[in-house]
Regions:
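N-terminal glycine-/charge-rich "phosphate-binding" loop or analogous flexible N-terminal tail
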Residues: 1-48
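A generic local structural motif
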Residues: 10, 36-40, 55-59, 80-81, ...
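A generic structural signal for alpha->beta connector loops
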Residues: 19-21, 66-67, 90, 143, ...
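Short gly/ser/thr-rich secondary-structure transition/capping motifs
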Residues: 27-36, 49-55, 125-134
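Phosphate/diphosphate ligand-binding glycine-rich loop within oxidoreductases
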Residues: 46-126, 138-139
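Rossmann-like dinucleotide/phosphate-binding beta-alpha-beta segment
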Residues: 134-167
Length: 167
């Protein structure tokens, strides 16, 4: 994963399941398979039975003969669609679909408020001690209609938050 090693989470897993061998690699996120192959030595794949990853996979299915399950941290798996593990094996691949709704809905509402309240323009004016007489025509969004394209976990959460805010 392209994040700092989660020592406390790994320690909790090890204490609960002492028979597990956990190997953590900080691998930058990339679609470049050649770079991924350099980041993870082939010998690490040989004994892997479960893989938790964003995009790093063994170069070929035979490089990980014991691999039984792959958990992606992404909501989708399209970044792996042409990989031989994805196309030529029956190894189950699970995604994190559905877990990102609250965070992305908050981002959507935040960017809507930044836009309708002209935050960027007002903040720049504030830094320069300039005060606009018309307030840059800030809009209240109560009563505005919100269109949601796609009604998955993210779209549903955006709708719930927007409704709670009077949209």
């Amino acid at each position: 994963l392209p994040i700092q090693k989660p020592d406390s989470a790994i320690e909790r897993l090890q204490s609960k399941f002492p028979h597990l061998k956990i190997t953590y690699r900080n691998v930058p996120w990339t679609k470049d398979r050649a770079q991924l192959e350099k980041e993870v030595p082939k010998e690490l794949w040989r004994d892997a039975t479960v893989l938790l990853t964003l995009s790093a996979l063994p170069p070929k299915p035979e490089d990980a003969p014991l691999l039984d399950f792959i958990q992606l941290f992404s909501a989708g798996s399209n970044q792996l669609a042409s990989h031989p593990i994805y196309t030529d094996t029956d190894i189950p691949i699970a995604t994190a679909s559905g877990v990102h709704g609250p965070q992305i809905a908050e981002w959507v509402i935040m960017t809507h408020l930044i836009h309708t309240h002209r935050y960027n323009q007002l903040y720049e004016a504030q830094k320069e001690s300039r005060w606009a007489k018309d307030g840059y025509k800030v809009k209240d969004s109560v009563g505005m209609r919100v269109g949601v394209l796609g009604y998955g976990s993210i779209g549903r959460q955006v709708g719930r938050v927007a409704k709670a805010m009077g949209r």
